[in-house]
């Protein structure tokens, strides 16, 4: 990607967002035209097509010059394009899983696919925003969509309850984020992310800016399910449809992490001595609370909800590195976690059904005997979540912890390694159940034949996780390209004043170990 500020084709800089918007509108228009009990699966395939086009448009954006559009509000660079591809891919696979999960006569599922598309628009806007107000707009678009998706099963007792809890706590976190933007504007006179960094060098209201940054971090910590702002996560995951949980647990987190990286490294690098200790504490709490909480769970979705809290902590470990390696490690881990989590929820969605007939770890006994394919895929994703070599999870954790160690965060890396050991126990508990013969008195586990949509979703997630574990170089190279986005002007100027950033030419690079 060539550096520049060309705005010759502004629409190309938001082409994936346009495609998802059109997809959502078309799905909403077509949905009422279907007979009451007709299958809405064609609308799901339409969403898959939209996600494919958005994915292709995102890859096309790699050929655009670095620059902004619409008066500096939208920014296209290697970092934003990397997360565009990730989020579009997550929506693609989630739509395939949903097509498999919904019953042919299920009503109103057209709205479910439309909400996926509209939520993707908000997440994509967050990742390419160069303006805090656009981040807020994208955050609200994605949040409203996920609130509704979380409570989409209206006949479920837990669905509406979890959605209301998610909405109330989410609104509270959004208020923190918005108030943080207001305080930042009061301290710097701007809400443009690159301009904030320059304004802080001459600002006389730095304490106000510190408070503003703290509020922004609190709002984003809620969105990524980081402790102690994680209380909504287990209930929301348990009450939402399983295909939706695969989307909820990955895409909004990826978007929020992208925003967190951009704000911390591009807008507030001079405050690294404030936000690094804060993120250190949040990372340690998230890993510990998430893994210890998962040990106590018998419900599979609640167990994976606590697991997602722990993985948010692993991602935050990379944030504290203050180096291109840390940013690249966080970006790589986001891809790895997305592939693993969407894949495992695809299996859970098919086994448990749209209505979650089977929810407990014991219910999965005999899965490998009833369906060797689903049992094998479940085992593969569990091993990857543990971090077994030749899986994406191994390299993801290796890059995160090595970045922390190289930056001197040795104790945080040790805490992460200890928590990775704790996680082995609850992942193996589900793995053991999958390959155990059920007792005669147990509920007979029945699984329907996987549909083409599910097989395609499983192939994409398994292949991605496997390739990331064997050939991580290409994805890591793209992640490093995005990381160096933050080391271009004007951040080089900030680096000379604050001593925060190293010269990209002399920065250490992550090297792949031999598994």
From Swiss-Prot:
Domain of life: Bacteria
Record membrane topology: Multi-pass membrane protein
Protein family per UniProt: Belongs to the complex I subunit 2 family.
E.C. designation(s): 7.1.1.-
Pfam families registered for this protein in UniProt: Proton_antipo_M (PF00361)
A GO biological process held by the record: ATP synthesis coupled electron transport
One Gene Ontology cellular component annotation held by this UniProt entry: plasma membrane
UniProt keyword list: Cell inner membrane, Cell membrane, Membrane, NAD, Quinone, Translocase, Transmembrane, Transmembrane helix, Transport, Ubiquinone
Name the UniProt record assigns to this protein: NADH-quinone oxidoreductase subunit N 1
InterPro entries, alphabetized: NADH-Q_OxRdtase_suN/2 (IPR010096), ND/Mrp_TM (IPR001750)
Quaternary structure annotation from Swiss-Prot or TrEMBL: NDH-1 is composed of 14 different subunits. Subunits NuoA, H, J, K, L, M, N constitute the membrane sector of the complex.
Residues annotated as transmembrane: 14-34, 46-66, 79-99, 110-130, 132-152, 167-187, 200-220, 241-261, 267-287, 303-323, 327-347, 375-395, 409-431, 452-472, 482-502
Compartment(s): Cell inner membrane
Catalysed reactions listed for this entry: a quinone + NADH + 5 H(+)(in) = a quinol + NAD(+) + 4 H(+)(out)
Disulfide bonds: none
GO-annotated molecular function: NADH dehydrogenase (ubiquinone) activity; NADH:ubiquinone reductase (non-electrogenic) activity; quinone binding
Lineage: Bacteria, Pseudomonadati, Acidobacteriota, Terriglobia, Terriglobales
Main subcellular location: membrane
Free-text function comment from the UniProt entry: NDH-1 shuttles electrons from NADH, via FMN and iron-sulfur (Fe-S) centers, to quinones in the respiratory chain. The immediate electron acceptor for the enzyme in this species is believed to be ubiquinone. Couples the redox reaction to proton translocation (for every two electrons transferred, four hydrogen ions are translocated across the cytoplasmic membrane), and thus conserves the redox energy in a proton gradient.
